[in-house]
Amino acid sequence: MTQKNKMSTYTKGMEIRRQVLGNKHVENAIKNTNKIDEKFQKFITEGAWGSVWSGDQLTKRDRSLITISLLAALGHHEELEMHFNASKNTGATYSEIAETLMHVAVYAGVPASNSAFKILKKVFQESK
């Protein structure tokens, strides 16, 4: 891959990252980046946002619900809360997220889904 293609993947990744997570979150991530995680931040911007999230086969809403289900199933609560907040930018509704968490309960276990529901209720209350 040429440097030009890498830059366009990074640029596209930053654009989508901002659309989904919001400028404030992305600016905080950039501000807090240092030599320890600089390579990692570039990796997630190009890999996750510039490649996976930029695909044209799924909507941002679909990707949001998939991401939420995986984060809930794996117990990644900090990222889960961030993506619950980001769902406002992807078009995923709280009722769709709740339905997604029902699938998590069946396929990943009730405790994983129960923890996710607690976080969702907190985020929902804070957004009122």
Predicted regions, residues:
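Short, conserved micro-motifs enriched in small and acidic residues
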Residues: 60, 64, 110-111
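Residues at alpha-helix boundaries and short interhelical turns
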Residues: 56, 74-77, 91, 108-111, ...
